[in-house]
Amino acid sequence: MGLMMTFIPTQKELFNKNIEALSNLFLKESLKEIKSSKFELILGKDNLDINLKDTSDNTFLYENVIDELNSMLNTYNDKYLLYPVLYFYGFGNGILFKALLQNKNHQHIVVFEKDIEIIWIMFHILDFSHELQSARLMVLQTSSLDIEFFSNFCSSKPFFQFSRIYFLELMSHYYERFHEDVLELNKKLVQDFKDSILSHGNDPLDALQGIEQFVYNLPQMITHPSYKELLSKRKGISDTAIIVSTGPSLTKQLPLLKKYASKATIFCADSSYPILAKHNIKPDYVLSLERIPLTSEFFNNDFGEFDKDILFVLKSYVHPHTTKYLQKNNRNFMLVSTYASFINYLKLDDFGYFNMGFSVANMNFLLAIHLKHKNIVLIGQDLAYAKDGLSHTKDYSNLDKHEGHFQRDKNKYTTQAYGDNGKVESSFVWTLFRHNFEQDVQKIQKYLDTKVYNCTEGGARIEGTIEKPFLWACENLLHKDLN
């Protein structure tokens, strides 16, 4: 039961002034809707002695307002004087932020709050409009933050640039009651900062190899069809795309895939291609983005007539052995570029660009989006080890390269299982791929009318996807043969 608080006209004006300065629309509307609060305002003799009493359990926001404020200020002026960005969990009475922002080195103070009644009261008491308007004070409600927020925030200036000095400070002991929310928030921020750092590349030799192979592949790129042509000819030609990856769950899906293959557009990973050939299931597209020679070996074969009408779509800095093997028996291929400064300078714009993500499955998924498929069905996308420790489907040609990996990763990357069926063991790389997928899926569902079905029936849960049996997808989405 909330207490009706009576604010005088000047306090109401102050609240409106603060609200006007707030750029976060969701928080702005949420604050306007509050009419009462469980908190009681406690004012001491000192102007800075502003406390709140939580009447639901008779606890206070601060045990000693002035002492805690001075202690925090001393710590921050001593240790963090030059930090461009500071992070707090809990708005408290807000006085600390006004004091810290006197220091011009602090470009932003980012405050996460779960209980916005605290902000509602303090916006009636103190003027934060200047700090809010300049965005030096950023206030965020934890329940409103989605995957897209974390992805955008952790990759934007100056937060990304100073991600190495990130730490989250509790405003006061009162906020310890939200420990689960604090830990979850911290985990997401740390993970997304890591993902953003990795997305910029973490190996200069890898980058140089990419540039070298891109230059080597240039003659092949400009003498084969362009990405622009692909979009103009094939955009929107079928509703449903099935993306075939090489997880342990793939084996059980192959008979059904074979039965319905003519009714969907099939995108497959380079590693799935020899497996589909073995089972005589013809994909429409085979994609590859790795720059190592081992991946090229998936194409060191000759499946004869099977390869007719398959289009091999390669990232423009794959290893040159890939194009050599494809040319050897006249397979149809094209090279497509991602966004990269070096590539953009060459102005070969017809041959790009699309963001391909970290894995060939991400690349398949994003190409399917650009080709305007309305339903995207994932199979073999486990992103986790099988119960017996297998990393990939039994037909996968490089299984021996992953021996011992299950033991190496056990209990380090545990995650929610598909179908909410307990937990599964994942790896560092798969966790990265999964986060990449989850970010893309959430953006797609927000801005496009595309449905993403995870029909792997095993492995890790990919948040945001619709989990359905593969049989359901085949029976409900695939009705007629494609020409």
What residues fall within each predicted segment?
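N-terminal donor/sugar-recognition subdomains of glycan-related enzymes
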Residues: 2-241, 248-265, 274-278, 285, ...
